[in-house]
Amino acid sequence: MVRVIAVSNPRLAQAFVDYMTTQGIELRVHNTGEAAEIWLADDSHLEQVQHELQQFLIDPLNSRYRAASWQAGNTDADLHYQGFSYLQTLRSKAGPLTLGVMALCIVVYILMQILGDDTLMYWLSWPQDSSQYLQLWRWVSHAFLHFSLLHITFNLLWWWYLGGPLEKRLGSGKLFVLAVVSAFFSGWAQSLFSGALFGGLSGVVYALMGYCWLSGERAPERGLMLPRGLMVFSVLWLVAGYFDILGMSIANAAHVAGLVLGLLMAFWDTRHRAHNEQ
């Protein structure tokens, strides 16, 4: 049995379970009092369930979900849909650390628009010389700097999509360690090529991509996954950055370092399971 997700609205959980029943996949709802947990009996269907869940959370009011509830005989499954919102979707998939980092990045971005990039870079950028080495926040705070609306939107969507489930399943501590370590090493790698003039959460995002993808491949029961198609796209995007065909400045070294680190951490965390299967 694999826990797929926990949601605050039990009617919503039942609607998704009913829909997956029409797809030939058995899910169960367990009410804990604080949330409704959805569990998957056969983990070989985990990737399909995760994909369908993403579509469901984007548009839970879609008629196909209501139709599935009627077909399954749960005709009251849609009575409380009006209480669901995009904010609830955001919160249901993310823990406090995921949401906190998103809020911090947004605040820093707004301040950069008001005070200018240079002001925030002065306080948050990667250490420029040895005199700043003891300003310990600089080793990770560069990840909160974003230089365009597209930059911050792209990174925060990926951070929420990958970091939220990781925090929900493995805890805030695991996400914190992965984020801090990947911010440090991706920043160090990028500084070798561009000095201290860089910023963004993309090094951490690539670490999450590597971690979630390899964890899903080696230990699907952990409940983490990244579809192979998205992983291929991410690697192609990384490669495209080296050929300057995207027409924008990209921290390529940070991306590579983050991806490699995420893969290594996932390999280490799943080593015992792989050993036990041999």
From Swiss-Prot:
EC number(s) reported in the record: 3.4.21.105
Topology class, membrane: Multi-pass membrane protein
Entry keyword set: Cell inner membrane, Cell membrane, Hydrolase, Membrane, Protease, Serine protease, Transmembrane, Transmembrane helix
Record GO biological process: proteolysis
Molecular function as annotated in GO: serine-type endopeptidase activity
One Gene Ontology CC term in the entry: plasma membrane
Subcellular localization: Cell inner membrane
UniProt cross-references to NCBIfam families, sorted A to Z: PRK10907.1, rhombo_GlpG
Name of this chain's protein: Rhomboid protease GlpG
Originating organism: Serratia proteamaculans (strain 568)
